[in-house]
């Protein structure tokens, strides 16, 4: 998009869970990443996949007072905060390790792969 003079921001979401996933997405051109499932897992989600029913047995995706009482909000908030802080620390470390001051300086040059298929399709150098 940049090569064609397009001024759009690219936010990647879906299947991103770890700082490694986030680094790859940003190095490949994403301006930001969005997380949802990973944060829900940190909160305590057990992936019953019934969020839309309002009957989440963990108490996350419900308005039922009995089910809501099962969620320890303080404990869940600490786990989400720990996940986000650890992720941020890992992103800062990777940025420094690759010789950059800003995560948005990352590029394909900072990545490598052992997969010929990935290399052929993404421009990431083959290790």
Language-model-derived ranges and their functions:
Residues 1-7, 17-23, 27-127:
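Alpha/beta catalytic cores of nucleotide-metabolism and tRNA/nucleoside-modifying enzymes
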């Amino acid at each position: 998009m940049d090569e064609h003079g397009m001024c759009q921001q690219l936010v990647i979401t879906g299947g991103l869970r770890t700082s490694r996933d986030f680094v790859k997405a940003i190095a490949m051109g994403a301006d930001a990443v969005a997380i949802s499932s990973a944060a829900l897992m940190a909160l305590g989600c057990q992936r019953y996949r019934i969020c839309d029913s309002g009957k989440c047995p963990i108490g996350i995706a419900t308005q039922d007072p009995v089910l809501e009482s099962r969620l320890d909000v303080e404990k869940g908030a600490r786990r989400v905060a720990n996940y986000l802080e650890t992720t941020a620390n890992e992103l800062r470390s990777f940025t420094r390790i690759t010789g950059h001051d800003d995560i948005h300086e990352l590029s394909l040059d900072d990545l490598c792969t052992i997969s010929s298929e990935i290399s052929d399709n993404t421009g990431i150098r083959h290790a």
